[in-house]
Amino acid sequence: MTTRTLDSYGFTDVDFVKVDVEGYEWFVLQGGVQLIELCRPVIQLEIVAPQCRKFDYRAEDLIAWMRDLDYRVCSKRDGWLDGVFTSSCKSDDSKGIYHDGRKRKGDMDLFFVPREQHTQLPPHLELFVQ
């Protein structure tokens, strides 16, 4: 099977990227760094902690990497997660923990929004961030 990176397509005008590749999210994003830096799209990822571990990375590493690219993190369930998400995503039951002690499921449907755009969210995201 032949694969290509996002960057290999040479896209120059991308507003939204959805990635749901059963644990391979880290590698898809790594292959799209130029696209992310040039286009600054909103990115939707489904992250499942056990799938991440299969590929030797942790969900919070991916989240931290996106924050380093100056993206804010938004959850459909919990709104903005800046400074809130602290899960190590290591436990066998794939549970994470929030600062306030609430447990969460191991799967996360997250939106990464460029910091410069977070006050002008696309309409489909405004439903999730109240």
Q: Predicted regions span which residues?
A:
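Conserved acidic-Pro-Pro-aromatic motif
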Residues: 7-129
